[in-house]
Amino acid sequence: MKGKFLIVFGLFFCLVLGMFTGCGQKEEEARVYYLNYKPEAADTWEEIAKAYEAETGIQVRILTAASGSYEQTLKSEIAKQMPPTLFQINGPVDYEKWKNYCRDLSDTQLYSWLIEPDMAVKNEKGVYGIPYVVEGYGIIYNDDIMQKYFSLSTRKTDFESMDDVNNFDKLRSLVEDMSCHLEELGIEGVFASTSFSEGEDWRWHTHLLNLPVYYEFSQKGVADEEELDFSYEENFKNIFDLYINNSCTDCKELASKTVDDSMEEFATGKTAMVQNGNWAWNQIARIDGNQVKAEDVKFLPIYTGVSGEEKQGLCIGTESYICVNSIASEADQQASIAFLEWLYGSETGKKYVTDSLGFISPFNTFSYEESPNDPLARQVVSYMSDSSRKTVNWDFTTFPSQRFKVEFGNSLYAYCKGETDWEKVVESMKQSWASEKALLLEDGKENK
């Protein structure tokens, strides 16, 4: 009887021990949970998650926030017992809101793969946001029209190709001479309309302003400023004046023009140049009456007259930074890093990035052939990979607020119409920057 009791007790003990051991193993299973920003990519991320699970056995949960609700969704999800292990921020300003949840990624392969390490969101303590997709912008030109210009016997410049145009002085002489030959070139203006319809001026108050801000930050060796000197304001004025004075649309009529109008003017051959990014190719190709061939759509850096700009590249950056949740378990953090390194390092993952997500990758694990198959994206990759060129970072992610951008855009249009002088534009911009940055600091103190 005693022997039977010992056998039964032994079996019971093993069963209980097995249950607790099993539970312990289950609790230690690593998980990956990605809070996706873009609804249009939701299905693709689900496919990626299934492919990763099939290959590794690790489950990846994907939750996609509704359009315009990412921050609200992140606040809700990150407070839960099983929060996202991967989430997105849009730059240094956003990092300040979420820095208590961002793991240092400086020791990861993912960070070491970055072609431009300075693109990461980082400080003296570590790396906290890694760009997972990049885009680039500059001056898009129609090389077919440019070749017509270079063949003119009456032109005043001696450029043989756009390769010879590598600073602002050369660009200005080219553009101003082209404006004297509009009829011969069959165009209505060198540049497409400098759009100032409501909400359509982001190319100037954000993308163009990025250049003087980038150069000021670089000169001072800083990543942000509470007060901006706007020390490169003359350089901004150089290129902005060139745009508005050599456009197909009179300065006083720009309030009626949209970005779509500008792209149509370029696509239909009415103009030779337009400032925009690689995302514009799909728009150009779809426009009714498009006359621009893929092989003729090319990029030129936005030259403004800064010393040494002959080596300047395109403005390349992102508003999409991936972060690993530092309050997740260490196992979950490591699993999430492994997932990202599979996505951007394995053949299977890279194919999803290029073919399904359509991303230009910021990592050196991708070859030129593994970039999206459109002419502008390919040129962004080419500029990124050219070690002789210095990429202009997207420092506009540090701009203090949307209100700052709107106010600067309004000042620019008043300048276009002759209702204010340039000095007032500069002073207004500096005051707006300082006041909006001060509000950010106050908000930061309240959120602590």
What residue spans do the PLM features occupy?
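Conserved N-terminal structural module of periplasmic/extracytoplasmic solute-binding proteins
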Residues: 5-8, 18-94, 107-110, 153-154, ...
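Extracytoplasmic/periplasmic substrate-recognition and gating elements
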Residues: 55, 59-60, 248, 289-359
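Conserved C-terminal helix/tail region of periplasmic/extracytoplasmic solute-binding proteins
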Residues: 59, 347-350, 361-363, 367-371, ...
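Short helix-initiation/N-cap motifs at beta->coil->alpha
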Residues: 64-73, 165-170, 253-268
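Hinge/lid segment of periplasmic solute-binding proteins
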Residues: 89-147, 296-303, 323, 373
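Short, solvent-exposed loop/beta-turn-alpha elements that line the ligand-binding surface or hinge
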Residues: 106-114, 157-163, 195-198, 213-238, ...
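Extracytoplasmic/periplasmic solute-binding protein
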Residues: 124, 128-132, 137, 169-225
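Glycine-centered hinge/linker elements that transmit conformational signals in sensory
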Residues: 172-176, 220-257
